[in-house]
Amino acid sequence: MKTSTVIFGGFFMADNGERIQIPVLENPDIREINRFFSVSNFEKKAGVLVFRIIPEPKFGHTELTVYFEKGYYLPMIQTILEDGDIGVENLKTENYSVKTMEIWGDFYPIEHISKNISAIQNIISEFIRQKQTPAPMV
């Protein structure tokens, strides 16, 4: 049986507007990710974090992308469904209010966005832990 690998990378914007590439990590553990969050001061920055499962499974979670801007986080998990379709899971998938918030120039229901960095770290931890086990987000 092949084992899967989680690849982590991304970028953030420095205060001077420069794009800072995050070094790619293979199979990061949650301590590395938490340490990265603690030293990066993300609540004042904008950027994108990507966790990708390689090789891509036939079905299940394949990628977690976390968009962040000014202390707000938008996690999105891409999932290959058993019928081969692609789905995206967010923090909340039904009963939206009409309120939206702009993240990286696009508007999203506020229910998809969180200021709670601990919740985002838990989502990342769960994604890394389960790798390709299909499961709903918290």
Regions found by a protein language model. Give the residues of each.
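Acidic, proline/glycine-rich low-complexity IDRs
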Residues: M1-K45, M76-V138
